[in-house]
A protein has these predicted regions:
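N-terminal helix-turn-helix DNA-binding core of bacterial DNA-binding proteins
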Residues: 3-44
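Amphipathic alpha-helical dimerization/coiled-coil segments
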Residues: 88-124
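A short, conserved structural fragment
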Residues: 57-67
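Residue-level signal for threonine
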Residues: 13, 72-75, 118
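Short, hydrophobic-biased segments on the C-terminal half of alpha helices
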Residues: 53-54
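Basic, amphipathic "hinge/linker" alpha-helix immediately C-terminal to the N-terminal HTH DNA-binding motif
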Residues: 68-86
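Key DNA-contact positions within bacterial/archaeal DNA-binding proteins
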Residues: 47
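Conserved catalytic core of two-component sensor histidine kinases
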Residues: 50
């Protein structure tokens, strides 16, 4: 795990951010987010989800209850909201590039860009 040397915080990778966004998006439709629903959303295995959830819990971005329900902490929710704001801004800017994209393609591209930006550039 890399540390952000200036702040002593653990670095968040693209994968971490994709999981946080997926948990946030699932939680919009249901109160109880499960490992299975995360695996389905991301198209990954349950063991992969378990490994990532442990990493996110170590970063205090989520909690997992005894019976498997997953919830974002305040810090996890704040991270998801920041990413969501950046995605919305990118969704507005991408069409200005003059390339024809469908709404779904714009959303996917905006998400990909938002999670790929360096830690310093994550606020678009």
């Amino acid at each position: 795990m890399k540390e952000n040397s200036e702040e002593g915080q653990l670095y968040l990778t693209e994968a971490h951010l994709n999981y946080i966004l997926s948990i946030y998006e699932i939680s919009k439709n249901t109160v109880d987010v499960s490992s299975c629903s995360i695996a389905r959303e991301l198209g990954v295995s349950k063991p992969s989800v378990s490994t990532m959830l442990s990493a996110l819990m170590a970063r205090h971005l989520l909690v997992k209850e005894r019976y498997g329900k997953v919830y974002l902490t305040d810090a996890g929710y704040a991270t998801a909201m920041r990413l969501e704001r950046n995605i919305k801004k990118l969704e507005e800017k991408i069409p200005l590039m003059g390339i024809s994209f469908t709404d779904d393609e714009i959303r996917k591209l905006a998400r990909m860009i938002a999670v790929t930006l360096s830690e310093d550039d994550r606020d678009v």
